[in-house]
Amino acid sequence: MTIRIAINGFGRIGRNVLRALYESGRRAEIKVVAINEPADAAGMAHLLKYDSTHGRFDWDVRQERDVLYVGDDAIRLLHQKEISQLPWGDLGVDIVLDCSGVYGKRADGEMHLASGAKKVLFSHPGSSDLDATVIYGVNHQQLQSEHRIVSSGSCTTNCIIPIIKLLDDAFSIESGTVTTIHASMNDQQVIDAYHPDLRRTRAASQSIIPVDTKLAAGITRIFPKFCDRFEAISVRVPTINVTAIDLSVTVTNAVSVLDVNTMLQRAAKGDFRSIVDYTELPLVSIDFNHDPHSAIVDGTQTRVSGKHLIKTLVWCDNEWGFANRMLDTTLMMARIGF
């Protein structure tokens, strides 16, 4: 059975989801029937085809009025600003991938359902009353057919939570801290301009900029036992894609660098192979651009202090890896039934 999906919001994640669908060869399983985006149709087609981060999309893309063609596939373009006005029922939409970055409350998901969708998947952390938050590769097996309003978490939770799980299962984590070294985002300024967050009033290309993060809360949502045992900070750096996460954890079991790297390398070759990768090559951030894994461990940067303090450096393409996990989760939501 082919799943009929709609994408609500055709920004960075929405476009990457569509592109990842075509590049990953999953079109037999997922069909995009509609995209809702307030922007004009010509701009939507142009930005799908030509991307400053991921390069040209290697499919024929054209737009005729409010229809986007990718190859021979026709996708209806909508420009509604209110979820309640979206014709998901008329279009036979099974799952809405809400990539707007605006919506994330249960009431928002319920509006998608009222408009005729069978299920909703948010591309960002949602409110605590959603049916589930899924970090694919860690807890996706907990999805149930009655889970209709679901969140995919964030790019950073998808990156770090698999590593936390692996370290905890192997060495028993007691507590931890996380520093996210994140590429610039579109909520920052090109040149100095007003923003409610005074640090984000400053030009993104000129500074390393500390920003607030709810990553610690995201970790606790997946692993309640770590409540009050993880803290996180985040800085934005002047690159347009790929994020590094510095994870430090104290563990119960005595370990060495070799112990940690051997375990992570085995996981990357085993059950986590599509989620986690491992490298000891002397790479830099741009080398991980367009990498579909949620997390890539840089084994050259692993450190152990006093046998119980582990520091790891983990890379992720914060757009492409996350877009691929959204597709994985979409397929899982369909397989368990409507």
From Swiss-Prot:
Keyword NAD: yes
SUPFAM superfamilies, sorted: Glyceraldehyde-3-phosphate dehydrogenase-like, C-terminal domain, NAD(P)-binding Rossmann-fold domains
Any one GO biological process: pyridoxine biosynthetic process
Site entry: Activates thiol group during catalysis: 182
Reaction(s) catalysed (UniProt annotation): D-erythrose 4-phosphate + NAD(+) + H2O = 4-phospho-D-erythronate + NADH + 2 H(+)
Record: residues binding substrate: 154-156, 200, 213-214, 236
Annotated metabolic or biological route of this protein: Cofactor biosynthesis; pyridoxine 5'-phosphate biosynthesis; pyridoxine 5'-phosphate from D-erythrose 4-phosphate: step 1/5
EC class name: oxidoreductase
Top-rank taxon: Bacteria
CC per GO annotation: cytoplasm
Residues of the active site: 155
Cellular compartments annotated: Cytoplasm
EC number: 1.2.1.72
Binding positions for NAD(+) per the UniProt entry: 12-13, 318
Self-association and partners: Homotetramer.
NCBIfam families reported for this sequence: E4PD_g-proteo, PRK13535.1
Similarity comment text for this entry: Belongs to the glyceraldehyde-3-phosphate dehydrogenase family. Epd subfamily.
Stated name of the protein: D-erythrose-4-phosphate dehydrogenase
Record organism: Tolumonas auensis (strain DSM 9187 / NBRC 110442 / TA 4)
Lineage, opening ranks: Bacteria, Pseudomonadati, Pseudomonadota, Gammaproteobacteria, Aeromonadales
